[in-house]
Amino acid sequence: MEIVEIVKIIIAGIICWLNFVLIDTYFGLPEKPGVLGAKTIGEKIRDIGGNLNGGYFMGNIVCSPDASAGTLLASIMNYLMGIEGGFIAALLVWIGNRLCADPGYAGTIGALTITAIIYLLNPIIEAKYFIVGMVLAIFTIQGFEHRYASILLGKIAKKMNRGE
């Protein structure tokens, strides 16, 4: 792997991270558990010393297709089919939200915004880098360190008036 590819992955990862964290926070994922299971996850994260609002955020993205799922699915579909694939991904995420009884639109918006970003940046950073970048972005929130990730998400939520 060349250094240029590594830089593209890092840039795509940062863009994906900002896309899904800011959209999910704006749509209120840290405020309360929006779907079944999110409350339990939030409380378990609080119990290990994490932030409850950050825990709700993490629980909501595990239990329903929010902007993290929308960003990843749209990145994959853009890679496979081009911009049309991104629109199909947005539709699939919207359907997934309805199946989960999730009243929100964060996942659909996340899919649409990353589709636009990939379309605009495609001459410089291809969709395949956004797939890898999004996997890494999700790992920083869900797979690395729950306590500290929840604290960071809680601070972002507080700055955006979406949590305590």
Swiss-Prot record:
Its main location: membrane. One of its GO terms (cellular component) is plasma membrane. The keyword Ribosomal protein does not apply. It comes from the Archaea. The keyword Endoplasmic reticulum does not apply. It is a multi-pass membrane protein. It is found in: Cell membrane. Keywords: Cell membrane, Membrane, Transmembrane, Transmembrane helix. The chain crosses the membrane at residues 3-23, 76-96, 105-125, 126-146. This is Uncharacterized protein MJ0527. It comes from Methanocaldococcus jannaschii (strain ATCC 43067 / DSM 2661 / JAL-1 / JCM 10045 / NBRC 100440) (Methanococcus jannaschii).
